[in-house]
Amino acid sequence: MRSIDGIAALVGQTPLLEIRYSYNGQPRRLYAKYELLNMTGSVKDRMAFYIIRRAIERGELQNGAVIAEATSGNTGISISAIGRALGHRVRIYMPDWMSYERVQLMHNLGAEVVPVSKAQGGFIGAVKMTQEYLAENPNTFLPRQFDNPDNVEAHEILTGPEIEAQLAQFGVAADAFVAGVGTGGTVMGVGRHLRRGARKVRVHP
C-alpha cells in the first residue's frame, strides 16, 4: 500500500519505562511511554498515521490529493511528515501565535503553513478555512482530528493493547492511566481498552 507500510515501522511500539519511587514510606511504581521515539517524537504520530492509513484503505485519500488540517502544533508536524513521505502536498492552518519553531519545522517537512489571526477566528477560523479549501479543491482530504472516530480508535485498538502487553511483561496490570488532552483521543481510546470487561481502571486527563 504505497509506502504506508514502511511508515508503520516508525510509529508505535515505543518503550515502556519503569519508574520506582516511594510514597508515605511505601514502594510505588509508575510506567511511562517513551513517545519521543515515534516518527516525529510525539504521540500524535499514532493518530495521524492511523487516520491517513484508514483513509487510504477506504479510498478517501487518493494519489495526488492535498491533505489539509487545522492544528496548533504536534498533529500538524505528524501530518506534514507522513504526508510528505507518501508524496502528498500538505496545507496546515494554524493560529498565528503558535511558536516559530513549530511553523519552521512544518515548512522544513514540505508543508504549506497558513497562519490564522484572532481576527480571522483563531483555531475555529482555521477549521473553517480547511472546509472552504475543500469546497474549492475537491481533491483534498481533511483528517478532521477533532471529530474523526479514527482518532480514538487508533488508541483503543493499537496503543491500549500495546501498553497492556508491555505491562504484562513487568507482571502487572494498570490501576490507572494518565495522559495529556488535546483532542482527547489518547485518553479516551486507551481508557476504553483498559476498562473493557468492566475492569476498574481510573482514567485521568
Name each region found by the language model.
Residues M1-P205:
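PLP-dependent amino-acid enzyme catalytic core
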